[in-house]
Amino acid sequence: MATKTVKVTQTKSAIGRLPKHRATLTGLGLRRIGHTVELEDTPSVRGMINKVYYMVKVED
């Protein structure tokens, strides 16, 4: 059975953001605006996405 994945794209800059939010973007594997990564849909990943919801776009 295939695991569910979620596509996350960074839409805003991390400059001037809280250090914890910048670290969360790094933890998600995002490096720059427009960068998209495909991650496993787990509760921990969802929590990280919720923390920086205003800087990312999510596609299921």
From Swiss-Prot:
InterPro entries, per database record: Ribo_uL30_ferredoxin-like_sf (IPR036919), Ribosomal_uL30_bac-type (IPR005996), Ribosomal_uL30_CS (IPR018038), Ribosomal_uL30_ferredoxin-like (IPR016082)
What does the annotation say about its assembly with partners? Answer: Part of the 50S ribosomal subunit.
Gene Ontology CC annotation, any one: cytosolic large ribosomal subunit
Q: What is this protein called?
A: Large ribosomal subunit protein uL30
- Keywords, in A-Z order: Ribonucleoprotein, Ribosomal protein
Identify a single GO molecular function assigned to this protein.
structural constituent of ribosome
Q: Does the keyword Cell division apply?
A: no
What protein family is recorded? Belongs to the universal ribosomal protein uL30 family.
One Pfam match: Ribosomal_L30
Q: Identify the coding gene.
A: rpmD
Biological processes, Gene Ontology terms: translation
Organism equals: Shewanella sp. (strain ANA-3)
